[in-house]
Amino acid sequence: MKIYLKLFGIFGVILLTQISCSSKNYHQPKGQIEKLIPSKYQKNPLTRQSVEITKKTYSFKYKFSSPSNEWFEWSWKYKRLETNEMINKFGISKSIFEPFQATEKNVKSRNRIIKTSLFKKEGNVISPDFNRMIPFYMGFTSPLYALTIRTLGKDSTPRERVEFLLRFVQDIPYGIPPTRSNSKVISGVLSPPQIFIEKWGDCDSKVLLLSSILAHEPRYKILLLHLDKHLLMAFEGRPHPNDAYIIFQGKNLFWQIPPDL
Protein backbone atom coordinates (compact mmCIF):
# COMPACT_ATOMS: atom_id res chain seq x y z
CA MET A 1 0.00 0.00 0.00
CA LYS A 2 1.42 3.38 -1.02
CA ILE A 3 0.53 6.55 0.87
CA TYR A 4 1.35 10.09 -0.25
CA LEU A 5 1.42 12.66 2.53
CA LYS A 6 2.07 16.32 2.75
CA LEU A 7 4.39 16.63 5.72
CA PHE A 8 4.54 19.38 8.24
CA GLY A 9 7.47 19.81 10.05
CA ILE A 10 2.33 -19.21 28.82
CA PHE A 11 5.75 -19.53 27.49
CA GLY A 12 9.07 -19.41 29.29
CA VAL A 13 10.32 -15.98 30.26
CA ILE A 14 13.88 -15.03 29.34
CA LEU A 15 15.48 -12.76 31.93
CA LEU A 16 18.08 -10.16 30.99
CA THR A 17 19.61 -7.50 33.22
CA GLN A 18 21.49 -4.38 32.24
CA ILE A 19 23.13 -1.81 34.50
CA SER A 20 22.83 1.51 32.74
CA CYS A 21 25.70 3.87 32.18
CA SER A 22 25.69 7.26 33.83
CA SER A 23 25.36 10.51 31.94
CA LYS A 24 28.35 12.84 32.19
CA ASN A 25 26.15 15.89 31.67
CA TYR A 26 24.49 15.85 35.08
CA HIS A 27 26.18 16.67 38.37
CA GLN A 28 23.55 18.64 40.29
CA PRO A 29 20.38 16.53 40.63
CA LYS A 30 17.16 18.36 41.34
CA GLY A 31 13.69 17.73 42.67
CA GLN A 32 11.19 14.97 43.12
CA ILE A 33 8.89 13.48 40.49
CA GLU A 34 5.17 14.02 40.74
CA LYS A 35 3.00 10.91 40.44
CA LEU A 36 0.64 11.31 37.48
CA ILE A 37 -2.83 9.90 36.81
CA PRO A 38 -3.49 8.80 33.20
CA SER A 39 -6.78 8.96 31.36
CA LYS A 40 -8.11 6.11 29.20
CA TYR A 41 -5.72 3.62 30.83
CA GLN A 42 -5.43 0.20 29.14
CA LYS A 43 -3.15 -2.74 29.95
CA ASN A 44 -2.44 -6.19 28.54
CA PRO A 45 -2.94 -8.42 31.63
CA LEU A 46 -0.17 -10.80 30.52
CA THR A 47 2.53 -8.14 30.67
CA ARG A 48 4.18 -6.89 33.83
CA GLN A 49 5.88 -3.61 34.67
CA SER A 50 7.53 -2.68 37.95
CA VAL A 51 9.90 -0.11 39.37
CA GLU A 52 11.67 -0.34 42.72
CA ILE A 53 12.66 3.04 44.11
CA THR A 54 15.44 3.42 46.65
CA LYS A 55 17.23 6.52 47.87
CA LYS A 56 19.85 6.18 45.14
CA THR A 57 18.38 4.14 42.28
CA TYR A 58 15.42 3.27 40.12
CA SER A 59 15.31 -0.47 39.34
CA PHE A 60 13.07 -1.21 36.36
CA LYS A 61 11.67 -4.60 35.38
CA TYR A 62 9.47 -5.19 32.33
CA LYS A 63 7.93 -8.41 31.02
CA PHE A 64 6.78 -8.31 27.40
CA SER A 65 6.26 -10.55 24.36
CA SER A 66 8.26 -10.69 21.15
CA PRO A 67 6.86 -10.81 17.58
CA SER A 68 7.19 -14.61 17.82
CA ASN A 69 5.15 -14.58 21.08
CA GLU A 70 8.18 -15.50 23.17
CA TRP A 71 8.19 -13.82 26.57
CA PHE A 72 11.09 -11.77 27.86
CA GLU A 73 11.77 -9.93 31.08
CA TRP A 74 14.23 -7.07 31.01
CA SER A 75 15.63 -5.33 34.06
CA TRP A 76 17.94 -2.36 34.36
CA LYS A 77 18.91 0.33 36.83
CA TYR A 78 19.54 4.03 36.76
CA LYS A 79 20.64 6.62 39.31
CA ARG A 80 17.55 8.13 40.89
CA LEU A 81 18.58 11.76 41.29
CA GLU A 82 20.14 11.89 37.84
CA THR A 83 17.00 10.40 36.33
CA ASN A 84 14.83 12.93 38.16
CA GLU A 85 16.89 15.73 36.70
CA MET A 86 16.54 14.31 33.20
CA ILE A 87 12.77 14.22 33.65
CA ASN A 88 12.63 17.73 35.08
CA LYS A 89 14.61 19.04 32.12
CA PHE A 90 11.50 18.59 29.95
CA GLY A 91 8.61 20.93 30.58
CA ILE A 92 8.00 24.64 30.33
CA SER A 93 6.59 27.20 32.74
CA LYS A 94 2.95 28.05 32.11
CA SER A 95 3.92 31.73 32.23
CA ILE A 96 5.48 31.35 28.77
CA PHE A 97 1.95 31.13 27.34
CA GLU A 98 0.85 34.39 28.92
CA PRO A 99 0.91 37.78 27.12
CA PHE A 100 4.25 39.59 27.29
CA GLN A 101 5.86 42.80 26.12
CA ALA A 102 7.79 41.96 22.95
CA THR A 103 11.01 43.81 23.67
CA GLU A 104 14.26 42.43 22.28
CA LYS A 105 15.36 41.39 25.76
CA ASN A 106 12.06 39.64 26.52
CA VAL A 107 12.00 37.83 23.18
CA LYS A 108 15.56 36.53 23.66
CA SER A 109 14.80 35.41 27.20
CA ARG A 110 11.57 33.74 26.09
CA ASN A 111 13.28 31.89 23.22
CA ARG A 112 16.05 30.72 25.55
CA ILE A 113 13.50 29.34 28.02
CA ILE A 114 11.63 27.54 25.23
CA LYS A 115 14.84 25.93 23.96
CA THR A 116 16.22 24.87 27.33
CA SER A 117 12.84 23.34 28.21
CA LEU A 118 13.07 21.04 25.15
CA PHE A 119 10.22 22.86 23.45
CA LYS A 120 10.09 24.70 20.12
CA LYS A 121 8.17 27.63 18.69
CA GLU A 122 6.68 27.50 15.20
CA GLY A 123 4.67 30.61 14.44
CA ASN A 124 2.36 31.07 17.40
CA VAL A 125 2.53 27.40 18.44
CA ILE A 126 4.81 26.20 21.26
CA SER A 127 5.19 22.41 21.45
CA PRO A 128 7.63 19.67 22.55
CA ASP A 129 10.75 19.52 20.37
CA PHE A 130 11.10 15.82 19.56
CA ASN A 131 14.18 16.44 17.42
CA ARG A 132 16.03 17.62 20.51
CA MET A 133 14.39 15.25 22.98
CA ILE A 134 15.44 12.12 21.08
CA PRO A 135 19.22 12.65 21.41
CA PHE A 136 18.87 14.19 24.87
CA TYR A 137 17.36 10.99 26.31
CA MET A 138 19.75 8.60 24.57
CA GLY A 139 21.73 8.34 27.81
CA PHE A 140 18.67 6.82 29.45
CA THR A 141 17.82 4.49 26.57
CA SER A 142 21.36 3.13 26.11
CA PRO A 143 20.70 0.11 28.40
CA LEU A 144 17.56 -0.68 26.39
CA TYR A 145 19.56 -0.64 23.17
CA ALA A 146 22.20 -2.87 24.80
CA LEU A 147 19.50 -5.29 25.97
CA THR A 148 18.09 -5.39 22.44
CA ILE A 149 21.47 -6.43 21.02
CA ARG A 150 22.00 -8.99 23.79
CA THR A 151 18.55 -10.46 23.17
CA LEU A 152 18.58 -10.61 19.36
CA GLY A 153 22.32 -10.88 18.72
CA LYS A 154 24.67 -8.63 16.77
CA ASP A 155 23.73 -10.39 13.51
CA SER A 156 20.05 -9.44 13.77
CA THR A 157 18.73 -7.26 10.97
CA PRO A 158 17.61 -3.65 11.43
CA ARG A 159 14.03 -4.67 10.71
CA GLU A 160 14.13 -7.47 13.29
CA ARG A 161 15.28 -4.98 15.92
CA VAL A 162 12.58 -2.49 15.03
CA GLU A 163 9.84 -5.14 15.12
CA PHE A 164 11.12 -6.45 18.46
CA LEU A 165 11.27 -2.99 20.03
CA LEU A 166 7.86 -2.17 18.62
CA ARG A 167 6.39 -5.06 20.61
CA PHE A 168 8.32 -3.87 23.64
CA VAL A 169 6.74 -0.41 23.57
CA GLN A 170 3.32 -1.78 22.57
CA ASP A 171 3.25 -3.88 25.74
CA ILE A 172 3.77 -0.81 27.91
CA PRO A 173 0.28 0.05 29.25
CA TYR A 174 -1.49 2.86 27.42
CA GLY A 175 -2.55 6.05 29.13
CA ILE A 176 -2.94 9.68 28.15
CA PRO A 177 -0.73 12.00 30.24
CA PRO A 178 -2.00 15.26 31.69
CA THR A 179 -0.89 18.56 30.21
CA ARG A 180 1.19 19.41 33.30
CA SER A 181 3.71 17.61 35.49
CA ASN A 182 6.02 18.85 38.25
CA SER A 183 4.45 22.33 37.96
CA LYS A 184 5.41 22.54 34.28
CA VAL A 185 3.52 22.26 31.00
CA ILE A 186 4.40 18.95 29.27
CA SER A 187 1.66 19.07 26.60
CA GLY A 188 0.56 15.48 27.24
CA VAL A 189 3.99 13.94 26.56
CA LEU A 190 6.11 11.80 28.90
CA SER A 191 9.88 11.64 28.56
CA PRO A 192 11.39 8.11 28.28
CA PRO A 193 12.45 7.94 31.95
CA GLN A 194 9.01 9.01 33.16
CA ILE A 195 7.28 6.35 31.04
CA PHE A 196 8.96 3.62 33.07
CA ILE A 197 8.48 5.32 36.41
CA GLU A 198 4.77 5.81 35.69
CA LYS A 199 4.54 2.38 33.96
CA TRP A 200 2.38 3.69 31.11
CA GLY A 201 2.53 6.12 28.18
CA ASP A 202 0.56 7.37 25.20
CA CYS A 203 1.32 6.97 21.48
CA ASP A 204 3.48 10.07 21.12
CA SER A 205 5.50 9.28 24.24
CA LYS A 206 6.12 5.72 23.02
CA VAL A 207 7.24 6.97 19.60
CA LEU A 208 9.70 9.26 21.40
CA LEU A 209 10.98 6.31 23.45
CA LEU A 210 11.35 4.04 20.42
CA SER A 211 13.12 6.76 18.43
CA SER A 212 15.55 7.43 21.27
CA ILE A 213 16.47 3.73 21.45
CA LEU A 214 16.95 3.38 17.69
CA ALA A 215 19.00 6.59 17.57
CA HIS A 216 21.92 4.58 18.93
CA GLU A 217 22.29 3.13 15.41
CA PRO A 218 23.03 5.81 12.79
CA ARG A 219 21.87 3.50 9.98
CA TYR A 220 18.25 4.03 11.02
CA LYS A 221 16.87 6.92 8.96
CA ILE A 222 13.75 7.88 10.88
CA LEU A 223 11.07 10.33 9.84
CA LEU A 224 8.48 11.50 12.35
CA LEU A 225 5.06 12.18 10.86
CA HIS A 226 2.56 14.53 12.45
CA LEU A 227 -0.83 13.31 11.23
CA ASP A 228 -4.32 13.79 12.67
CA LYS A 229 -3.04 14.75 16.14
CA HIS A 230 -0.82 11.66 16.22
CA LEU A 231 2.91 11.17 15.89
CA LEU A 232 3.91 8.31 13.58
CA MET A 233 7.26 6.94 12.41
CA ALA A 234 8.60 5.83 9.06
CA PHE A 235 11.98 4.33 8.12
CA GLU A 236 14.00 4.76 4.96
CA GLY A 237 14.41 1.52 3.01
CA ARG A 238 12.85 -0.93 0.61
CA PRO A 239 9.32 -1.84 1.72
CA HIS A 240 8.24 -5.47 1.99
CA PRO A 241 5.02 -6.74 0.36
CA ASN A 242 1.95 -5.31 2.11
CA ASP A 243 4.03 -2.65 3.89
CA ALA A 244 2.50 0.80 4.03
CA TYR A 245 5.01 3.34 2.79
CA ILE A 246 5.29 6.94 1.71
CA ILE A 247 7.32 8.86 -0.84
CA PHE A 248 9.32 11.68 0.73
CA GLN A 249 11.83 13.75 -1.24
CA GLY A 250 12.04 11.00 -3.84
CA LYS A 251 12.84 8.24 -1.33
CA ASN A 252 10.78 5.34 -0.06
CA LEU A 253 10.06 5.45 3.65
CA PHE A 254 8.41 2.24 4.71
CA TRP A 255 6.72 0.58 7.59
CA GLN A 256 4.83 3.30 9.33
CA ILE A 257 4.42 2.79 13.04
CA PRO A 258 0.68 2.79 13.80
CA PRO A 259 -0.79 5.49 16.04
CA ASP A 260 -2.21 2.90 18.45
CA LEU A 261 0.98 2.10 20.33
Language-model region placement:
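Bacterial N-terminal signal peptides that target proteins for export
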Residues: 1-8
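A structural boundary/capping signal
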Residues: 6, 21-261
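Hydrophobic h-region of N-terminal signal peptides that target proteins for export
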Residues: 12-20
